Regions:
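Surface-exposed loop/turn motifs in large extracellular/passenger domains
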Residues: 1-90, 94-222
Length: 222
């Protein structure tokens, strides 16, 4: 569990790996859990790579869980946060307990990945505001077999600086946008939403727009 602030400086060419595993065969298990308002900071002066990973197997609950407001910050180097699920558990889940802020300095990157190899729940489920700040880049990628790649409900993508790319890939529906979804990208920034479905079923789509989705300065790719 990550509580408070986790700060790291990783030198250029070096790698810091932090991995949590939930091996429960029953009940609720979380691979990597963030407590309220937790922050992970890859500090300036490094230039290396930081990988955080949460892994769940059969019977577990969530690979990476951010239940409240949180911050991921990369000021020098690249950060990857990955949820892996081999069961019906979510690979990456963030509820509506506050905004998730992705802060990247120019030349730095944050990549969120949810990878799921079984049916059940979606690879990534986000129910909150995603704030992208800082001049660098960030991406959110959900890859699923048997369910939706990325499920969003009642969410705002708010890109005030830099670029954010949202990618959903599935053998069912790539990205499912439910309820009111707001998209915003400031001048000079890019918000790309890309959904890919390998299914031939008429009920599946690259991006499924359910209701009331609106945006400005945004690109949608199917």
């Amino acid at each position: 569990q990550i509580g408070g602030s986790l700060n790291a400086t990783v030198a250029t060419g070096s790698l810091l790996n932090i991995t949590g595993r939930a091996n429960t065969t029953g009940g609720l298990g979380i691979g990597l859990n963030f407590s309220a308002s937790a922050a992970v900071n890859l500090l300036a002066g490094g230039g290396g790579t930081m990988n955080l990973q949460g892994i769940v197997n059969s019977g577990a609950y969530i690979g990476v869980f951010i239940p409240n407001a949180g911050t991921l910050s990369a000021q020098s180097g690249n950060m990857t946060v990955t949820g892996n699920s081999t069961s019906n558990a979510w690979a990456f889940y963030a509820t509506n307990g506050g905004a998730l802020t992705l802060n990247t300095a120019a030349g730095s990157n944050i990549d969120i990945v949810g990878n799921k190899t079984a049916g059940g729940n979606s690879a990534i489920s986000f129910w909150r505001t995603i704030n992208k700040v800082g001049l660098g880049n960030a991406s959110i990628t959900g890859i699923s077999q048997g369910n939706v790649g990325i499920f969003n409900s009642g969410l705002t993508y708010n890109v005030t600086a830099g670029n954010l790319r949202v990618i959903g890939i599935s053998d069912t529906t790539g990205i499912n946008l439910a309820n009111t979804i707001n998209f915003y990208a400031a001048a000079g920034s890019t918000l790309s939403v890309e959904g890919t479905s390998t299914s031939t079923a008429s009920t599946d789509a690259g991006i499924n727009f359910n209701t009331n989705n609106r945006g400005r300065n945004c690109n949608f790719f199917r």
